[in-house]
């Protein structure tokens, strides 16, 4: 078997080979390993014996590996194997030495099987087939037997050594021939597997030809049905195109409705702003009314002051009237005294003292009159001052009244502005109503178009029913094809 492998075994390739997964795939679980060990005759004693030979493996590993690779390099067919690996020969020798040392581990479980399976896969990737693999192992058989023979005959004499050498010489040819037979048997197995694979491929090809013949009629029916579906699809497409045109009209109407809605929204914004202005003006009117109310309150207070001043004038007038009465009494008494003085004067000659008394009385009355006159003068001055104060209060009243009038006028102007704003709001609402009417008309037109679209949708639905029936037929045909194809499995 020649080496036709062109795969380069790199570190990534080696790391990508999972020995455990490979062992699981070929069925090397614990039960299978136990059966193979038992069938081969490897029991606990055998394992113990192999473990006891570990010193021998360690002593001979390097020499055996060197002989192993020298043997491979001596044949042209196996020389190409080294070019398929990125490892050097020395690195390969180290790996092979580790393999030999593993023979004496004494435990041959799933871990051992996974490692050996991985090594076997790497050999396969390298292109090292069963013929080379089994043939090259005769170098290990020879080396290990020679090492065992040397170990056995040590210090046992020439006769024993000759007997062992004869045993080795007689057994090695048999072992080599058995290995050769194993190579041929392995090739036979491989050929058998390959032949069965070819037979299976031929069988599948024949079945595929039969399937192709069987599906020809259903496929023809499927083609005819598909053609019918295509025709109905054209019909549906025409209806769909018409529906698209109508939907374009609907879209335009919707655009018009959208424009109306935008106009309504814009008018609503204007109405909102007008309402806000009206509200602000109303607040100003309320503030103006409050100012007017405060002004009128001030007027009321000023009026109260005027009233109090007038009342004080009235009281002063009463006092003046009282003083005037006193003056009248004094005048009357003065007249009487004057009369008496005249009388007494006539008697002056006889009673001068009586005249003097009268004169004193007149003098006293004159002084009292003078005091009363002074008091009257003071009262008059006080009345004049209070009168001036009353006049000032009346001026303030007039001023407050003027301010009140101004506030009322401002309130009236504000109320007029509120009225105008309300009128603007009413006008805006009228515009909203008009736009809403236009929107209603557009909506009716859209509704009519939607009815037309609905009718076209009914036609499309009918066409879809026909397509559904054709599709069902296709499904049944596909089922027939599936049953026929199922024969391939």
Swiss-Prot record:
- Lineage top rank: taxon: Archaea
Annotated Methyl-accepting transducer domain ranges read 218-454
InterPro entries, A to Z: Chemotax_Me-accpt_rcpt, Globin-like_sf, Globin-sensor_dom, Globin/Proto, MCPsignal_dom, Protoglobin_sensor_dom
- From the UniProt record, give one GO term of the biological process aspect: signal transduction
Per the database entry, which stretches of residues form a coiled coil? none
Q: Does the keyword Heme apply?
A: yes
Q: Which GO terms describe its cellular component?
A: membrane
What is the role of the protein in this entry?
Heme-containing signal transducer responsible for aerotaxis, the migratory response toward or away from oxygen.
Q: How does it assemble?
A: Homotetramer.
Q: Which family does it belong to?
A: Belongs to the methyl-accepting chemotaxis (MCP) protein family.
Q: Can you say what this protein is called?
A: Heme-based aerotactic transducer HemAT
Instruction: Tell me the gene name.
Output: hemAT
């Amino acid at each position: 078997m020649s080496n036709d492998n062109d795969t380069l075994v790199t570190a990534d390739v080696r790391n990508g080979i999972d020995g455990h997964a490979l062992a699981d795939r070929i069925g090397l679980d614990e039960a299978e390993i136990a059966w193979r060990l038992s069938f081969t005759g490897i029991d606990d004693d055998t394992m113990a014996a192999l473990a006891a030979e570990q010193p021998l493996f360690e002593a001979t590993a390097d020499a055996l590996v060197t002989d192993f690779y020298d043997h491979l390099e001596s044949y042209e067919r196996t020389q190409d194997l080294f070019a398929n690996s990125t490892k050097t020969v020395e690195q390969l020798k180290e790996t092979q030495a580790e393999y030999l040392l593993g023979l004496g581990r004494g435990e041959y479980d799933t871990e051992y099987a996974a490692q050996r399976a991985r090594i076997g896969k790497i050999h396969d990737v390298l292109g090292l087939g069963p013929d080379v693999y089994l043939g090259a192992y005769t170098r290990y058989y020879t080396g290990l037997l020679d090492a065992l023979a040397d170990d056995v005959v040590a210090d046992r004499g020439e006769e024993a050594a000759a007997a062992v050498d004869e045993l080795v010489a007689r057994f090695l040819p048999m072992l080599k021939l058995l290995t050769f037979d194993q190579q041929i048997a392995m090739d036979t197995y491989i050929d058998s597997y390959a032949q069965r694979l070819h037979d299976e491929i031929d069988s599948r090809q024949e079945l595929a030809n039969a399937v192709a013949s069987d599906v020809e009629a259903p496929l023809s029916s499927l083609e005819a049905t598909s053609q019918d579906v295509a025709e109905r699809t054209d019909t549906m497409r025409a209806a769909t195109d018409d529906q698209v045109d109508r939907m374009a009209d609907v879209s335009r109407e919707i655009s018009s409705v959208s424009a109306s809605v935008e106009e309504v929204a814009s008018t609503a914004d204007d109405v909102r702003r007008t309402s806000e202005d009206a509200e602000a003006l109303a607040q100003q009117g309320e503030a103006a009314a409050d100012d007017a109310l405060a002004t009128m309150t001030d007027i009321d207070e000023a009026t109260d002051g005027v009233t109090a001043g007038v009342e004080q004038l009235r009281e002063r007038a009463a006092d003046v009237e009282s003083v005037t009465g006193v003056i009248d009494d004094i005048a009357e008494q003065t007249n009487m005294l004057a009369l008496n003085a005249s009388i007494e004067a006539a008697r002056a000659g006889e009673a001068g003292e009586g005249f003097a008394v009268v004169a004193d009385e007149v003098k006293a009355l004159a002084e009292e009159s003078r005091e009363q006159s002074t008091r009257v003068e003071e009262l008059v001055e006080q009345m004049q001052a209070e009168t001036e104060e009353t006049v000032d209060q009346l001026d303030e009243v007039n001023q407050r009244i003027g301010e009140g009038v101004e506030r009322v006028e401002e309130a009236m102007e504000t109320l007029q502005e509120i009225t105008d704003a309300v009128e603007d709001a009413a006008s805006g609402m009228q515009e909203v109503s008009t736009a809403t009417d236009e929107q209603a008309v557009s909506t009716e037109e859209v509704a009519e178009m939607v009815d037309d679209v609905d009718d076209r949708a009914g036609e499309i639905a009918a066409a879809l029913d026909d397509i559904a029936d054709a599709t069902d037929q296709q499904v049944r045909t596909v089922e027939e094809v599936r049953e026929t194809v199922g024969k391939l499995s």
